[in-house]
Regions:
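Surface-exposed interaction regions that form or flank ligand-binding interfaces
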Residues: 1-70, 77-82, 93-96, 107-241
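Short glycine-enriched loops at secondary-structure junctions
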Residues: 88-91
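Acidic/polar active-site rim loop that often engages polyanionic ligands
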Residues: 100-106
């Protein structure tokens, strides 16, 4: 038995095996971050195709008067409006609308619910509305999905990456008289300090964790309490309503 254990330990501590174990751990830890960065990269590349009358700022962080920081994936400033873009690298079948608190994502038999990204982006819109002193109708909230997900989302503010430029170009009424000035304001207020950005990420994770805990025993459809029920195949969590 001891000999078998020694041989097993020798195998585990071989350099090649250790490297594979470390890589697997790193992939597990950073997979979501990598996927998110990849999505933002593709959207950033697409926005580079816009003409010079559109000014683009990527990955900005701003602080509002109440001290809350907001990290925004992409902002496009033009005379046709301020486009506030949130990138979501979802995969599978996605179902939702403007008003649902959470959207359904289905991959095969696996179902998960995520917070409505339009609601998240609304906070970003309001933050820019405050610092730029603009009415809300001059800011356009867009959620862009770069992946090949199947969308069943009832919203004019959700677009795929290959429709993004057409979506932006569909706004033809001139509503902004000073796009260059607004571009400079956002650039000057953009937080670039790494330490402050880390604090924002930490706070955002804590808020998400608290929200997830709050919604843990809530029905994703109506918000009612989930209770234990008995079914044909045993106990399951069902809506109390």
């Amino acid at each position: 038995m001891e000999l078998i254990l020694v041989e097993a330990l020798k195998t585990i501590f071989r350099p090649q095996v250790l490297i594979m174990i470390i890589l697997c751990i790193l992939m597990d830890v950073y997979y979501k971050k990598f996927i998110g960065m990849a999505g933002e990269f593709w959207v950033k590349r697409e926005l580079k195709k816009l003409s010079d009358e559109y000014l683009v700022i990527n990955d900005i962080m701003i602080k509002t008067k109440d001290g809350i920081t907001h990290q925004i994936d992409h902002v496009v400033i033009s005379k046709y409006g301020i486009f506030v873009i949130e990138t979501k690298q979802y995969n599978g079948y996605i179902k939702g609308n403007d008003y649902d608190k959470r959207w359904l994502i289905k991959n095969g038999k696996k179902k998960i619910y995520v917070n409505n990204p339009l609601h998240q982006n609304y906070g970003h819109v309001k933050s820019l509305e405050e610092i730029l002193n603009l009415p809300e109708e001059k800011l356009i909230s867009l959620v862009c999905i770069p992946s090949r997900a199947t969308l069943s989302v009832k919203s004019n503010n959700v677009t795929r990456i290959y429709d993004l430029l057409d979506k932006i170009a569909s706004y033809k009424e001139e509503v902004i008289g000073n796009p260059n000035e607004l571009y400079e304001i956002i650039n000057n207020l953009n937080i670039t300090d790494k330490a402050e950005r880390k604090v924002h990420v930490k706070n955002a994770r804590e808020i998400k964790s608290n929200k997830d805990e709050e919604l843990k025993n809530k029905c994703p459809k109506c918000g009612g309490e989930l209770i234990k029920r008995n079914g044909k195949y045993g106990e399951f969590m069902g809506c109390s309503n």
